[in-house]
């Protein structure tokens, strides 16, 4: 049986792994075995943090809405309940943007929600 040389295939695989970990420090960007471990960990972190980002932004939107709503002596839960009962199709992201960028519009939305119920 003839000998199969895999130098080209192995080098190609190694270069692909090293390219993934190009920004890492020390051996994680130079040696294949630590680089492979680092690449696996990096991909796991990025997968986890894609879902975490959604959660974090929702927390941020809620905090912004809560801070703005408290100025009008209404709690966050009361404000969300009033907005939903008044059949306004505004989600938390929209409300947070309005609260940050245009406070008077947010005030009119809140008063409309209060008086419509």
Curated annotation (Swiss-Prot):
Its main location: plastid. Binds directly to 23S ribosomal RNA and is necessary for the in vitro assembly process of the 50S ribosomal subunit. It is not involved in the protein synthesizing functions of that subunit. Belongs to the bacterial ribosomal protein bL20 family. The lineage of its organism: Eukaryota, Viridiplantae, Streptophyta, Zygnematophyceae, Zygnematophycidae. One of its GO terms (cellular component) is ribonucleoprotein complex. Coiled coil: none annotated. One of its GO terms (molecular function) is structural constituent of ribosome. This is Large ribosomal subunit protein bL20c. The gene is rpl20.
């Amino acid at each position: 049986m003839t000998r199969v040389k895999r130098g080209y295939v192995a080098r190609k695989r190694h270069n692909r792994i090293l390219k993934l970990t190009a920004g890492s420090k020390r051996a994680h960007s130079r040696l294949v075995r630590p680089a492979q471990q680092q690449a696996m960990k990096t991909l796991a972190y990025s997968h986890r943090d894609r879902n975490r980002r959604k959660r974090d932004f929702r927390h941020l939107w809620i905090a912004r809405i809560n801070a703005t709503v408290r100025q009008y002596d209404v709690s966050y839960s009361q404000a969300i309940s009033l907005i939903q009962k008044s059949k306004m199709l505004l989600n938390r992201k929209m409300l947070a943007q309005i609260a940050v960028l245009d406070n008077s519009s947010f005030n009119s939305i809140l008063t409309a929600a209060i008086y419509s119920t």
